[in-house]
Amino acid sequence: MNNVGTIFNIQHFTIHDGPGIRTELFLKGCPLQCRWCSNPEGLTRRIQPGVYRKKCLGKRTCGLCLSACPQGEKGPLTFYRNKLIKIDYEKCTGCMACEESCPAEAIKVWGRRITVEEAMQEIRRDKGYYDRSGGGVTVSGGEPLLQADFTEELFRSCREEGIHTCCESSLWVGWEEIEKMLPVTDLWIADIKMMDPEKHREYTGGSNAKILENLKRLSEIPGLRLILRIPVIPGVNDDQENMDRTADFILQEMKGRVQTLQLLSFMRMGEEKYTSLGMPYQMKDVRFRRDYFQRKIRRFADEFSGRGIHTLVGTREKEEEKS
């Protein structure tokens, strides 16, 4: 178990990403930049200190972070009106002395390195819950297949101990990374964000061609279990044409070989984390009526179901997903 991964979170007792009660590892690094992403700390592989300025005691009152930083006043710590407001990552060396010195927890480190064995020690703690609920381990991100060697070894270790494995991937990776995971993955979860390639590039930073091609190839594998998701975003992909084209793709290009299609309603989440990382939250000004939007999603779900695609609103119903 020599591979080392970079993660930004481990969640125990999750129930949304795969069947049963699960432990979910979130790996850092993603090839896309979706505007609605709720986990900006997962976009880069780099371990980053984030700033929660409201907690800062002040440069004059405290200033311990500045004293601890090897670069001092000319370093990456940026103050405004006596408060630490951001960290210049171009200057930051990643020593994390600022975080270690802060008594108010105004600096949070996003990310840590972990070996497969260390991850397995976390996973084994909940083995009894997996067995009783039909649960297991999910690896998400970021994009877990950017760290395919680590993810493959982790899943192989889980398999050896009888633990169900689920990979939640953007599929914006080469087929060789996916192929490496096939023998050790019990369930796949992937998104179809939108069908228009230029609009996909505008809102995610990349074309959807690679994703769609990988989905077609996955659908050709006998017995492969795949949950598809559409994150439904107001004013972005919630139009009738996009939903119709998505259904056409599933039925014609994937031959309907999808276990479940899940429609996930947009939630305004992660804004505080964007601020901590000095990044703009691009969905801040999105306005919509929640009740109307939910009815719209329900209508889309009924239309997908009417075309023979098993469709849920949300992720909570778990029926034949268990292996």
Predicted regions and their residues:
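Conserved Radical SAM active-site core
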Residues: T44-V184
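Conserved AdoMet/S-adenosylmethionine-binding subsite of the radical SAM
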Residues: E117-S276
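Short glycine-enriched, charge-decorated loop/helix-capping segments at active-site entrances
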Residues: V51-R53, R201-S207, G278-F288
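Glycine/serine-rich loop-strand microenvironments at binding/catalytic pocket rims
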Residues: K28, L32-P40, R46-I47, S67, ...
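Class I S-adenosyl-L-methionine
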Residues: P70, P103, K216, R298-S305
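Flexible, acidic/Gly-rich N-terminal and inter-domain linker regions that tether
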Residues: M1-G63, Q71-E73, C92, S323
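Generic domain-boundary/flexible-linker signal
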Residues: W36, R45-Q48, A148, D239, ...
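Auxiliary Fe-S-binding modules of radical SAM enzymes
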Residues: M1-P19, P234-S323
